[in-house]
């Protein structure tokens, strides 16, 4: 039955104790609304099972008024459901304090209440609570928090960008890495770190419709982010007054949003902290006219504090289009296209001078003059040191120039040339005779490029008797190729789902080669199973056959043989296909196998990609521009042209490609590349993450957590476990992920090849959710144990108290970094002396044995009068350490923010991309954080009573 709630009553959240005291605002039907004034948060709960505990103090308790004065309770009245406390204040005067006027920061002394009420927990739970506090503290202070838990190999430039961007207040940046460098992972890392730190709590992701599924898979698989995909159907069917308010992370197709004004209104009303826009280069802007998509994103960017734009490289975009993206981020700074062009031209010689310094290690007189003109007299000493061969001075000079870079803080652009670490590509072409059955096919959209689809679609063709794969020579070739490669993993990609499914049938019927298929008609779970079957080295499929759309968002870097069963109609799609294997971190040469039908449009398309665009052996940053320029001539010539016409087109396109590539190379901005790559900072993060991966602390901790909650674990295979709820499962809300069970691994490499396994890190929802269940409830906050130590007289009682320094503040202030909930131990002997400095927790723990609950309860009741004053005395013992900890937290917070303010203020003087709002927000955060830390209080977290035996 639902509890009786009255407006004004004070309750505390069982799952979010850090919110402070809550005040009931309203009870409406089946919903209860509670305000938490300390943080400004409001929560709605289902009335039947609200995770709340009534705050009710007893005579003898000390309580605090919201104005700060204290009183000792003598009597409690219940007036129409509201509690009224009567007692004495500090001046020994009689006072009355209604619960509505209680301080929002009051702690709830739950541990002592439970101990004396006979609610004594198993001994192992007390240790679990202590270790949970320690691990939580360590993670909150870690520089890797939000960076190490992604299901991906740690890569330096991605980690550098993620930390640099995510640690800003309301970041507004352009991510413009070249293809294959992982812009989506960078954006996901920024989102993940901002969510974990509390800098953002509501995120909007706008993408082209065809990329929605890819983003959904990436966010869920790599980051464990439960993104809600919104389309017209979901929006219309929702019962909520504003469907967007029901989710923290919304994934929305821009095409639908532009056409639906009602959805736009709801989106604006929902309020967001961070907006991510993929494929932002497709937003069309001209000085005199903008597209509806650009106008909508511009309006959103005016109201949403943080904006991430993912786009093609500036060189691919052209200067005008590049300016249009920057204008979305900071319209005050980038308001005049002509001024932007002039500024870019003025900066080019400086970038060229830096290129010279990087390549030759010294500056020519002309380069020296250029940099001196840019830095002014303040750069003279630095330039002199550079000329003397001082390498440290060279690094400082580059940093000075970086700080002054016109777009260095808002634009991140890494290139393959700068990053390195990509595999070589090898092309194997297989011309095959075109079968007669394809020669008489009716013409259609790209019918000659995908003849099997057109053939099978003919009304007079029987699916069972006349299958295209019985005569198409590419199928026989594929079977022979797979047999030659034996058990080597091979990825096959084709344009259509029908072709993929037919190929699987063909391999099963004609060869018995183990194969699996991957297409857009399958749900995520089915695709996971197919990917896992392909990844399994021992019993898995040799070949995975993917359709174009079905393979989006999936990378199979453990394979290095790629069969392009047909060719796509656009070079970007070709690059996407090759990119399934050709990613940074791939350890093998990419073997590209391309069968095509001779004297058909397939042969000509192969020649176009290979001879004109060079798109097989290298990435093709100019492909989109060349397709746009030559596309109208290309399509007719694919089907019908003499050799002379065709060769002329190939030659013209090749010449234009070489010209554009030369332009791109000379336009390379080495300063920007240095800034985007992190100049070595990312490498340190990679090393730290790999070191953390090798530690055993997490598996050891999780084993104790699983034991406590009744989760059974058994070996699945090497580096993998199967988790299942046991009959004794303690809490059905434990975030196992699946009621039937789940397979997990702590091994990053295993997780990368087996997407059906959960990759367990400190950031995983199972770990975080389990830790929250321990700390937000009362689990393990009382225990009684027998201590076996010959130095102690039998019957001696020791009292171990765990306190935490608690600060109630909005998560966005990130005060947990400075004042984490590490346990402050106090171990009191019979004389009230604190022995904690001499007896470590683990040393003590090893000497303890459990006591039957009934015996423990009997002992506590007998010792209540002796224990209660000792518990009250414990706080005074740890108060000096608490005060030191708070002072140190304030010092570190002030030092960090002062340093960042000084850096940004100096930077603003030479680089206008530092926004005033950023400095104002940082100052406010400093003052607010220091004030909140001043109010930090000690909270009794757990009590363990030890009896010598």
From Swiss-Prot:
GO terms, molecular function: ATP binding; DNA binding; helicase activity; hydrolase activity, acting on acid anhydrides
Statement: the UniProt record of this protein carries the keyword Hydrolase: yes
Top-level lineage group: Bacteria
Gene3D superfamilies reported in the protein's UniProt record: 2.30.30.140, 2.30.30.930, 3.30.360.80, 6.10.140.1500, 6.10.140.2230, P-loop containing nucleotide triphosphate hydrolases, Tandem AAA-ATPase domain
Motif (DEAH box): 278-281
Domain Helicase ATP-binding per the UniProt entry, residue ranges: 164-332
Classification via InterPro entries: Helicase_ATP-bd, Helicase_C-like, Helicase_RapA, P-loop_NTPase, RapA_C, SNF2-like_sf, SNF2/RAD54-like_C, SNF2_N
Protein name: RNA polymerase-associated protein RapA
Source species: Pseudomonas fluorescens (strain ATCC BAA-477 / NRRL B-23932 / Pf-5)
